[in-house]
């Protein structure tokens, strides 16, 4: 038994993780460093996790000023008949964009997804083209979309790595965040009818720090989840594709989060509030010296208890008068 003990103590930390799904990944949000992965580039069906792209494109339309959260979206017979996970929208009426977005985020609603796609691009098919163009732009090499819902389709796949990259993009939208962490809500239809919304991502209720994510499940994809959690200013993204049960996928993502938070932390390498160079001499200036700051904070992922090794280099090539506070000098 003494041998056994020794092996356990010397086991590499990563070996402690037993994630028996088709694919999995744990990524540091800030640096996109992959902490753990298994089969993370394999092309697999990901079911409703396809909707991360549908949501991203919807928020980008809002960003561009092509629509707003208040925009009234007309529904079609086609959208209302989608089946699968849905919020039972009525055809031939108008819903506020925000209500449809909320239905996609919380309930993974196929009908609401198609209504948004049809509004944005005129048809789901045209919207899918947009999805694939965006995937190319984001260098998602192992992703191909055939619809905006994730309903089974022969030519449709993604991978754990691409799903993580996509959720990172979506998390930049404050409005997404405000809804993705909500556990229960309701959708009030134009007729006054109400549909209960319960977040399909149970971890927003049962895992402290988990505030976002997208579930997916079909018989071919198995049970999937891409989720994000934050503790002490350290954010992780975890992906599980093809778990055997709904509970198993939540357990696996919980294990990934626990592992990441227990073993890693985010260290600030460059703090934008502290001068990189103090009293830098500026040529031909009335006020001869100035402090120079980094434009943004830079973080480094580090294993707990280890010093992080790095070099900081900068080039100051534009520090000549006239200069005002906030000017870029290098």
Q: What residue ranges belong to the model's regions?
A:
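Active-site-adjacent loops and short helices of periplasmic peptidoglycan-processing enzymes
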Residues: 2-161, 165-174
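Domain-terminus/edge residues, biased toward the C-terminal soluble/receptor-binding domains
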Residues: 140-144, 152-157, 161-330
């Amino acid at each position: 038994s003494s041998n056994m003990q020794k092996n356990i103590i010397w086991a590499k930390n990563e070996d402690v993780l037993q994630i028996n799904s088709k694919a999995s990944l744990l990524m540091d949000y800030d640096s996109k460093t992959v902490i753990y992965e298994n089969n993370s580039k394999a092309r697999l069906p990901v079911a409703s996790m396809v909707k991360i792209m549908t949501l991203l494109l919807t928020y980008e339309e809002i960003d561009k000023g092509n629509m707003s959260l208040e925009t009234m979206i007309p529904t079609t017979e086609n959208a209302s008949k989608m089946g699968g996970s849905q919020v039972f929208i009525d055809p031939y009426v108008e819903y506020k964009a925000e209500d449809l977005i909320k239905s996609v985020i919380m309930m993974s609603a196929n009908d609401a997804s198609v209504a948004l796609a049809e509004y944005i691009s005129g048809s789901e098919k045209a919207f899918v083209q947009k999805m694939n163009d965006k995937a190319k732009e984001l260098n998602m090499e192992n992703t191909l979309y055939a619809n905006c819902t994730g309903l089974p389709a022969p030519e449709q796949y993604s991978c754990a790595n691409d799903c993580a990259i996509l959720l990172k993009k979506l998390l930049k939208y404050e409005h997404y965040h405000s809804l993705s962490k909500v556990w229960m809500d309701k959708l009030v239809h134009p007729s006054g009818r109400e549909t209960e919304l319960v977040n399909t991502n149970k971890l927003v209720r049962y895992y402290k720090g988990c505030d976002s994510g997208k579930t997916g499940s079909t018989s071919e994809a198995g049970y999937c989840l891409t989720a994000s959690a934050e503790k002490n200013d350290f954010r992780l993204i975890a992906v599980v594709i093809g778990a055997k049960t709904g509970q198993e996928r939540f357990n696996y993502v919980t294990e990934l989060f626990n592992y990441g938070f227990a073993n890693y932390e985010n260290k600030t390498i460059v703090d934008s509030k502290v001068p990189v160079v103090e009293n830098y001499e500026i040529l031909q200036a009335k006020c001869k010296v100035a402090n120079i700051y980094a434009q943004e904070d830079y973080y480094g992922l580090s294993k707990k208890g280890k010093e992080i090794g790095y070099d900081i280099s900068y080039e100051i090539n534009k520090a000549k008068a006239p200069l005002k506070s906030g000017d870029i000098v290098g």
